[in-house]
């Protein structure tokens, strides 16, 4: 899909739980080849970020790389397209609330998408409610951690879980890469930011155009779960990718890039 020079955007891509900027490598290359700026970030204690999971005490600290990147966007007239995958949708939501004027659109790719008037932990709570116990953790490991907020747990995604729930439609090379690079992740479900029903406002978060990309072959967050989140935020545009597993950027990178470029052309 071609783009005009006037519609080129800066995409900032945010990974999901336990992953890192590395998972966006196909999408970053395609967006840059199309003439866009594309930046994939490591959240704190993720990917190549130097912190350990027990050194990151709050969800805001975890999301700080994104918040700092959005705050620093200083090109004249530059507005960003924020793209969040899975748990990364919650970091994107926080950035939308803080910097709505800097965001042309936010794209939630098989992602947790909160809504105004409810706390940010609601999508995760609903996901757990809908998921049968035997399919929730499989061979994932729960790791005890202690940080500045006290004791808690992080999760390590197991190889069978990755193969059956996240990457079942993706190339074998991408599954192998994920097995080597995933790190323990913290969902921060007890963080005050996750429990504040007044955090997301109509004037900020609600004012930013949202697009939800439904992964129709997602074995983790089912299509029904994804549509439930869309229904909770009326006015959200919807795109669908047939055959996309949870790791949409690996199973259907070309289709995802086409959608992102279409969004860049549509929203100024």
From Swiss-Prot:
The lineage of its organism: Eukaryota, Viridiplantae, Streptophyta, Embryophyta, Tracheophyta. Induction: By infection of leaves with certain strains of P.syringae pv syringae. Keywords: Hydrolase, Serine esterase. This is Esterase PIR7B. It comes from the Eukaryota. Belongs to the AB hydrolase superfamily. InterPro entries: AB_hydrolase_1 (IPR000073), AB_hydrolase_fold (IPR029058), MES/HNL (IPR045889). Gene3D superfamilies: alpha/beta hydrolase (3.40.50.1820). The active site is at residues 86, 218, 246.
């Amino acid at each position: 899909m071609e783009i005009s020079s006037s519609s080129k955007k800066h995409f900032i891509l945010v990974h999901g739980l336990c992953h890192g900027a590395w998972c966006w490598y196909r999408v970053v290359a395609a967006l840059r080849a199309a003439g866009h700026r594309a930046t994939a970030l490591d959240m704190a204690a993720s990917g190549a970020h130097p912190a350990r999971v027990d050194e990151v005490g709050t969800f805001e600290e975890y999301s700080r790389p994104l918040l700092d990147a959005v705050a620093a966007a200083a090109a004249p007239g530059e507005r960003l397209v924020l793209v969040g995958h899975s748990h990364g949708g919650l970091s994107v939501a926080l950035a939308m609330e803080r910097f709505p004027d800097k965001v042309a659109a936010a794209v939630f790719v098989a992602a947790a998408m909160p809504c105004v008037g409810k706390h940010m932990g609601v999508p995760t709570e609903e996901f757990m409610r809908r998921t049968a116990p035997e399919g929730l953790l499989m061979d994932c490991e729960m790791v005890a951690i202690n940080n500045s907020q006290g004791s808690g747990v992080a999760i390590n995604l197991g190889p069978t879980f990755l193969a059956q729930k996240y990457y079942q439609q993706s190339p074998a090379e991408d599954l192998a890469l994920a097995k080597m690079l995933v790190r323990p992740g913290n969902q921060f479900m007890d963080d005050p930011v996750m429990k504040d029903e007044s955090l997301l406002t109509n004037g900020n978060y609600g004012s930013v155009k949202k697009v939800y990309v439904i992964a129709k072959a997602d074995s983790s967050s089912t299509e029904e779960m994804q549509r439930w989140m869309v229904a909770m935020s009326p006015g959200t545009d919807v795109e669908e990718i047939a055959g996309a597993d949870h790791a949409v950027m690996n199973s259907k990178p070309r289709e995802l890039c086409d959608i992102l470029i279409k969004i860049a052309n549509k929203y100024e």
